[in-house]
Amino acid sequence: EMYLGGQGVGEATDKLLYGEVNPSGRLAETFPLRLEDNPSYLNFPGDGVNVDYAEGIYVGYRYYDARKMPVRWAFGHGLSYTEYEYSNLNMPAESLDDKGCVKVTVDVKNTGSMVGKEVVQLYVSDKNGTAGRPVKELKGFAKVELQPGETKTVEFALTARDLSFYHEGLGDWYAPSGTYEVLIGHASDEIALRGELSFKTEKQLPLYVSGATTIGELMAHPVTAPIIGGLMQNMQGAMGAMQSDPTENVEDTLGTGAEMMKAMMHGMPLKSLASFAGAEMAAQIELMIQGMNQALGNK
């Protein structure tokens, strides 16, 4: 694929084919196996007047990664008359915050017999289960020329912005606290090295409390956590008083462990908690919802 090579494309192609020059270009798009594999296939060409661009962020490699779909040639793919080896992925600081910067270095070696240029690609993957995020995203690349047998160190810099997506409710770029994977590869489907990065943000997403809000969401917010925590303690005390044997463990009675109970409560919406707790507690929960929205500044 020579793309629009200009007036001298014929001579350039001749030099590449006969080995006078080592190719070092990379595809800036994905070549699918079939036309029907394109993410826009169902929406194009539209109704003759309007076209619905329904792919959202899932275009190119983001779409094929999410679908785990094989392709003809991947984003970032390129040919060479030599081969390259990656090693020593290093991040001196393995944690990052909103204002910090992490240096990422990797060694690249030309293991062939011809001088060449390699395009080192850095991708980032959100490992926190954040809804609506791609499997990975390109966040940096660098082209480096290497003599046969030569090794060079390539350096990247990652900031919070590289981990983030634009959050409409917040009106700002946002990345949740947690674990992110740093991937180094020859192309989007040829990942050679992986490393983990821990991120901590001070940004708080806007929260409006309703019956559909889960206990886990409330426990994760510094304003609502003390309020819901107090309610849970009151409920735990009430359940303990209802037991005929004060020494009996509620978890044993339910036949489950502490972790399973914690996971169940984490995903439980307040309206389910209200129905579980009885009429008196349901009224208390309704008042608590109003109080939490006031504390959050919601009207």
Indicate where each model-derived feature is located.
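Sec-exported extracytoplasmic/periplasmic mature domains
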Residues: 18-22, 224, 233
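Extended, compositionally biased non-globular segments
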Residues: 232-299
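Intrinsically disordered, low-complexity Ser/Thr/Gly-rich stretches
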Residues: 58, 68-70, 80-206
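Intrinsically disordered or highly flexible coil/loop and linker segments, enriched in small
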Residues: 8, 70, 111-117, 129, ...
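A short glycine/threonine-centered beta-strand motif
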Residues: 108, 229-232
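Low-complexity, Pro/Ser/Thr- and charge-rich linker/hinge segments at domain boundaries
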Residues: 200-220
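Secreted, periplasmic, or luminal enzymes acting at the cell surface/secretory milieu
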Residues: 1-117, 183-184
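Thiotemplate assembly-line natural product biosynthesis machinery
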Residues: 220-230
